[in-house]
Structure formats: structure tokens, C-alpha cells
């Protein structure tokens, strides 16, 4: 259904604005009407600015000597001609006055003011008409068909919701009653075009029950058509979604205003509050104390006396605007304080409600001494699942959250592990750097002592007395005693270390045995072999009182030969040891051990299937031999000393488990290196068992 625009009273006939049905969406742009203003529109400006306004057809020229844009001072109401006439006589008389009389006269002159009891007139009555410039005319919109019963407060609010309004002037008739049309000026071309788009189909609801609704008529100058087209092509085309959202918000606000206007009680209450606020502002403006600046006749030279009332009124308007801005600022502060108070009150109510819910939950389930974090997490978990979810959906949602929590915990553990490994690697690097620095320092100090002792001259040192021995013999003796005690302690430690090495002979043998375990080949010894070497006969009448607990081996490993190319023979875990009448020499013993070690299979499957005499795998062998070897190999494979893997491997051998099972257990940690690592460990175990059995 389309509504026709009703013609405003007292206005000339104008082309009708095309209507759009109510079913059209807001986002569809509506073609506005561009029509010329009435020929006699200038005569309407008198009604805008009062009966005393005058229309200036010719604007102020640019070459005018007066600059009205500068700050204007308020002048007192002096009789200009009388002041000019009396000024010359006063200057002549002042020459003959005493000094004190001159100062009194100056003081009286400074206190001269115009009476402030004059009643200020309103802007509509006294402010003269200022013709709009071309830019203002391009942003001006004629609005007609306004209901006369509608207060001007609502029109101002509607226009401000449509765009940034610069001014709104509603025409009044001779009886000072509002007419059905007015002029609205907007701040920018964009705001003007947006308001024209939003208000083109705006309908004022009925102001009383059973009354008709009225559609506003919008008329603007024909020249504004190019402005509107430019806005559509530039702003509306490039930022279409943004403009659509803005227009939707404007229309939504206008709908809310229409609801307030259509409700008589709400409209009356708002109009009454606005009228009271306006009367209060006018009363405050009347009570504002104006400070006037005294002037003399010289200040009035070059100013048209007829413009003094206009200048005074401009100053008054400036002061009124300043006072109004202060009141607006104070009102904004009060509103912010009230909003903040309301916000804090709501937050306190929310916390109080959460506390009540928590107390109800504790009393319902009889839960006591539960951490607040646990209860809050439970409440959040319950609130986060919508009530519309079915049991299956709630189950899958809880499962998804549980999986997400487990993933987060896994990543956290991985992060901690990475940080721990980085710290451990940095510590190892620092330790290696420290050892290298100590080695360099010791080497340098030894070189220094060697050079000093080589060129030391007792006679020369006694003569120059640079050494402590010649400077202070008693101090040198004390220091030497301390140094000697330190050296004796170090020598004792070195002797213990040498005894331990002699007992085990393990340093060189372990290296060569590990090379064989890794490469599957024996290492050639540099010690010469004699085909007809000497032999030693040892006659023993009885067994030693205390047999050695473990074999001291090392010589056979140093004499191992390279593995031959032929296939190794079968290996028995319990080889028969020959019992010659005379003790074997080192060469024969090494040859026999080499033949036994060569029989150990190299392939992984054959090596893993080889039986092990677990009765000879003692705790001493595991701790002193196997643990050191496993530790070294773990560091070679993963770069760090992982104690958990070392302990797991040793425990696996201690429990007499096979190699295949160890490979499956270490697959996650070592991946493709697990079979090679296990083969080296078990090959080394077989070598140790052979050496132990021959001890």
C-alpha cells in the first residue's frame, strides 16, 4: 500500500515524492527527489530568524577592511557622537589636572560599564540573518509535511539520528507557531546523502488515537543530484556492506523513535522533561554574569555604530555557547558516574548470585572443603554445555573437551621435556668447555715452568732476589710445606687410581672389545708374535688361599686379530677349557680366545637366537661392565645420558629376557636404531661371558 504525500499548508505545489511499499527491505536504496526550491524561498528566511531579520543579497566582499572571523570583544553602550565630541575637551582639561586627580579619573574610566540589567533577547528575535554560502546550500534539505502538533524536539532528534546535523530551522508564522516545514543543514556531503537515503520513506506515526500517519516530504536543490550520485558511486559502491549496516542502524533507531512518538504517554513525558531542561538552560543563561571590557573613544574609531548591537549579540551568543559546553561536559561526567555505579552494582549482584549458587550446590551435594577452583571449573563445565543438547551430544562434547585437555597436557609435557633437554645439553657443553680450558691452562703452566727451570740461575736469583726462596726463606718453607702436603694427597689419589687400573686392566681392553662388538671384527695388535717363543713353567703345590673374585682381563683383547673371511663356526655357550700341564703363554691364550669370539654370529637373528648362560650373568658384571657400555651407546644414539633407558636395558638383562623383546620395547625411543643397539649390547654380553669363563 502506498501513501501519497500531503501538501503542506502555505507551500507552493511541488512534485510528489515516489513512494515505496512497506515490504521493500531497508537495504535497497530508494531514489530521492531532486527538485528546484520555490522561487520565493528567500522570503521564508525571515520567519526562521524573526521579524527583525534582514536579508542581505550581496555578501560581504573579500576586500572588506573588517574581519568578523576574529574573536570579538563586548563593547559598552556609549553615545558615540557625544564621546567623540567630549574626547578632545577631556584631553585638553587633563593637562591642567593634578596627578592624583588624573589617577582617579583613570580609575573611574576603567570602572565604566554598561548596565547589565538589560534583558537579553532570544536568538530568534535579535540574531540577524546570515545568508548561507554555496556549500551550505548544497548540504541543505527542505523538509515538509510535518505535523503541526509534533514538537520541534522530535524533529531535531529524528534529523540527528539520520546524520550529523549542523542546524535545523523550522519556520514559524506571524503568531510564532510552528509551521509544517523547515530547513535542515548537515555537516558533510556524506551525512547529507545518508540522511536523504534514510528519510526518503520515513512515516510519522499517528500522534493521537485514530489519527492519520504522515509521510515527510523531502525537497532539495537540483544541483545536489550530482552530490548524491557521487556518494553512491564512491562511498556506497566501494564500502557497500559498511553503508548497508549504517543505514540499517539508522532505520532501526528511527523505528524506536516512531514507537516513542506513537505512544502518547511516553511522548508527553519526554516532551515535558525536554521543556523543563530547556527552561532550566534559559534560566542559567540569564543568570550568567557577563564581564564587560571598558573602552574609550579611540577604540571605537573605524567601527560603524550600527554594528555595535550585532557585535554585542555575537559576544553574548559565544558566552552562552561556552556555558552550554561546560554544562554538557558536567552532564557527561554525571552520566559516566551513574553508569559506572550501575555497572559496579550489577557486578556485585552477579558475584553475590554466584556465591549463592555455590552455597546451594554445596548444601545439595553435601560437599565440604572443596577447593574453589574445582567448584568453579565444575560450574563452568555445566554452564558451557547448552541445555538443548541431547545426551549423546553432551557426551561427545565432554569427550572432545577431555581429548583437548589431554592434548594440551601432552604438549605441556613435551615442552617441559624440550626445555630440560636444552638445559642438559647446555650444561654438557659448558662442562666440555671448562675441561678444555683447564687442559689449556695446565699445558701453558707446564710450559712456563719448563722454560723457567731451564734458564734458572741460583747466583743471579740470589743477587736480584726476585724469587720467594731468596726474598723470605721462612715464608717459602711454610708455603712449601703446604704445597708438599697437597702434592702427597694428589699422589695418594693417583696411586689408588693406578691400582684400580692395574686390577681391571680394562681401559685398553674395553676399547678394543667395543670396536669388535660394533664392527664384528677383531682388532690387530701391534705386539709382535714369535712362532717359537719362550714359555714359562709354573709349579704350584697348593691352591691359593684367597681365590680372586673376578678375572683380570685385558691382555687377550689387546692381542685380538682381524676376523677371517670364512663363515664362523658354531658357538657353544660353555666351551670346554683345555687343561694343559703347563700354563699357556700369552700368544696361545690370545689365539684361543680369538677363535672363541669369532664364533659369535654377526647377523641379528642368529645373534638373538644364541643361548646365554644366565648363571654367569652376575650383578657385578651388570653394574661394572654392562652399565658403562650401555651408557656410552645411549649417548652415541640419542646425544644425552638418558638414565631411564639405561636402567630399563640393564633391568631387562637382569630379568633374563631375550633380545627380540628388548627391541620391541625400545622401538618407541630409538625407532630404526633399536635392532642395531640391541645387537651391540648382546654381542658385548657374549664377549664378557667368554672372558669370564676363561678367567
Swiss-Prot record:
Coiled-coil parts of chain: 265-369
Single biological process term from Gene Ontology: mRNA 5'-splice site recognition
Region (Disordered): 85-134, 487-509, 540-590
InterPro entries per UniProt: Nucleotide-bd_a/b_plait_sf (IPR012677), PWI_dom (IPR002483), RBD_domain_sf (IPR035979), RBM25 (IPR052768), RBM25_RRM (IPR034268), RRM_dom (IPR000504)
Protein localization: Cytoplasm; Nucleus
Polar residues: compositionally biased ranges: 98-113
Start and end residues of each PWI domain: 605-695
Signal peptide: none
Keyword terms: Coiled coil, Cytoplasm, mRNA processing, mRNA splicing, Nucleus, Ribonucleoprotein, RNA-binding, Spliceosome
Residue intervals of the RRM domain: 139-221
CDD domains named among the record's database cross-references: RRM_RBM25
PROSITE patterns given in the database record: PWI, RRM
GO cellular component: cytosol; nucleus; U1 snRNP; U2-type prespliceosome
Source superkingdom: Eukaryota
Residue spans of biased composition, Basic and acidic residues class: 85-96, 487-506, 548-561
MF (Gene Ontology): mRNA binding
Quaternary context: Component of the U1 snRNP particle, a subcomplex of the spliceosome. Interacts with prp5 and usp102.
General function of this protein: Component of the U1 snRNP particle, which recognizes and binds the 5'-splice site of pre-mRNA. Together with other non-snRNP factors, U1 snRNP forms the spliceosomal commitment complex, that targets pre-mRNA to the splicing pathway.
Protein name: U1 snRNP-associated protein usp107
Natural source organism: Schizosaccharomyces pombe (strain 972 / ATCC 24843) (Fission yeast)
Gene name for this UniProt entry: usp107
